[in-house]
Amino acid sequence: MPSREIVEAFAKRLEDGDFVGAILDYYTPDAATYENLAEPVVGRDKLADKERGVLAAFKKVTAVRLGPSLIDGDVVASRWKFSFTHAEGATRTLEEVAWQTWRGNEIAEERFFYDPKQLGR
């Protein structure tokens, strides 16, 4: 079960823009993430590579947590607002809920729930 301090430190890394560092420091080596109902991406290194690709596709990416993270044993739920700015200057905003299963002080599984229409899909 993660402590409140660990969850807050993880959230701060995202809000500070250190998305790849947060993955490398807070996810288990065999972590899996799911985007809505898509097949998972498995493995911390693959997750970090995927995140690098997302960051390279945009001029700027920001994250703001909307309210506190809710912690119940090994489960943490957080509501996020991400903004993605393209090189041309257009910005798209995505609100999502991240549902995490922690193993000690590391994330073993994370599921992102959002409406893909927010991204023009």
What residue ranges belong to the model's regions?
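Hydrophobic beta-strand positions in extracellular immunoglobulin-like domains
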Residues: 82-84, 102
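Short, cysteine-centered beta-strand-loop-beta hairpins and adjacent loop/turn segments enriched
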Residues: 56-60, 84-93
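A short hydrophobic beta-strand element
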Residues: 73-82
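A solvent-exposed, acidic/Ser-Thr-rich amphipathic alpha-helical stretch
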Residues: 4-6, 20-74
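Solvent-exposed, amphipathic alpha-helical segments
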Residues: 5-13
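Short, surface-exposed coil-to-beta transition loops
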Residues: 62-64, 79, 92-98
